[in-house]
Amino acid sequence: MTGPTTNTKNDLMIVNMGPQHPSMHGVLRLIVTLDGEDVIDCEPILGYLHRGMEKIAENRTIVQYLPYVTRWDYLATMFTEAITVNAPEQLGNIQVPQRASYIRVIMLELSRIASHLLWLGPFMADIGAQTPFFYIFRERELIYDLFEAATGMRMMHNYFRIGGVAADLPYGWIDKCLDFCDYFLTGIDEYEKLITRNPIFLERVEGIGIISGEEAINWGLSGPMLRASGISWDLRKVDQYECYNEFDWEVQWQKEGDSLARYLVRMSEMRESIKIIQQALEGIPGGPYENLEVRRFDKTKDSEWNDFEYRFISKKPSPNFELSKQELYVRVEAPKGELGIFLIGDQNVFPWRWKIRPPGFINLQILPQLVKRMKLADIMTILGSIDIIMGEVDR
C-alpha cells in the first residue's frame, strides 16, 4: 500500500490588475503572476489612452497644437506648454523678454507643487492613509485659484506662447501668491508631522522598491526616481533654461533609492519650489510679457468689396512662422522627470517630426523588475512611488 502522492509543483495564479483598478493611476493594466502572495512576474499593458499626439502635431502649426499638449500630463500642464514653445523658440532663435521668463518660472514651479500634491494624496491612500488625501486638496485648490486668476483656466491653461506668455499677471496677483507661499510652508510641516515618522507608513515604504544609482542610469530614469537613488541631476541646474540660474536653490536628492527616499525627494522639492517662487516674485522685472516680433506676418493682398475673403478682413490670424530645416532636442525638468521633444523642421509651418520623450513612460519600464519577489500589497506602494500619468505614458 502506497501513501498519498504530493504534488511539488507550485500552483501559480494569474491576476489582472486594471485597467480600471482604483490604484492604477489611470488606465494601466498589470498582468501579475502570483505564488501565494509573492509576485513572480508582472507585465504592464499600455495603450488604452493612446490618442496619436505625435501624429496630430505633424498636421498643426505650433500655435494650433498648443491646446492639445495640455492633455499629455494633465496634472502638470505648464510643463507640456513650456516644452512646446521652447522647441520652436530655439529653432527660430526667438528671444524671450526677461519678465516673461520670470512669469514662466513662477507658473512652472506652482505647477510642480500642484503635481506633487496630487501625487502625495493618492500615494498615501494606496498604502492605507486616507487623511492626507483630503488635506492636499486645500493647498491645491489655492494654486488653481492663482492659475485661474492669471490664465482664466484652472486646468489646461493654454498660457504659454512662442516668445512669451498670453497675458501679464493681473493686479494684486503677486501679493496673493506670496501669501500662498507663506501659508504653504506651514502646510508642508503639517504633512511631515502626519506622515514622515508614522510607524505604519515607514513599514510600508522603507526598503521597498530599491533602485541603485547604476540601475537608475541604465534604465534611463529621471526626476525624483533618479535623484532618490543618489544621483544629483536636475535639468534646471544642468541646462539652466529660462532664468533658473538667477535664483538660489539646491537640488534635492537621497541615496537610499527606496519608496521612502522618493517620497522625501518630492517633499523637499516642494520646499525648494516655494523658495524659487518667492525669489522670482520679489525680483520680477518690468517690461513686455511677450516678444511682439514673433507676430509679424507676410503682407497679404488687399481684399476687394465682393471678394470672398472680405468677410474675414477683421479676423486676427494666429502667428505662424516656418520651422527651419534642422533637428533639435529640447528638454525640461518636469515633476515626473525629463520631458523632452525631438523636433525636425522642414521649411514648413508644420513640423516634419515631433517626437515626445515622456518621463512617465521611461520610468514605468522598471516596474516589472521592482515588483518581482515582493508581496502583492507592495505593488501599490512601488507603482505609487513611481508617479505616472497615463495621458503622457500612452500619448
UniProtKB/Swiss-Prot annotation:
Record's GO cellular component terms: chloroplast thylakoid membrane
Catalytic activity: a plastoquinone + NADH + (n+1) H(+)(in) = a plastoquinol + NAD(+) + n H(+)(out); a plastoquinone + NADPH + (n+1) H(+)(in) = a plastoquinol + NADP(+) + n H(+)(out)
Superkingdom: Eukaryota
Residue ranges that the Swiss-Prot or TrEMBL entry lists as coiled coil: none
One MF annotation (Gene Ontology) recorded for this entry: oxidoreductase activity, acting on NAD(P)H, quinone or similar compound as acceptor
Major place of residence: plastid
Role this protein plays: NDH shuttles electrons from NAD(P)H:plastoquinone, via FMN and iron-sulfur (Fe-S) centers, to quinones in the photosynthetic chain and possibly in a chloroplast respiratory chain. The immediate electron acceptor for the enzyme in this species is believed to be plastoquinone. Couples the redox reaction to proton translocation, and thus conserves the redox energy in a proton gradient.
Protein name, UniProt field: NAD(P)H-quinone oxidoreductase subunit H, chloroplastic
Species whose genome carries this gene: Lemna minor
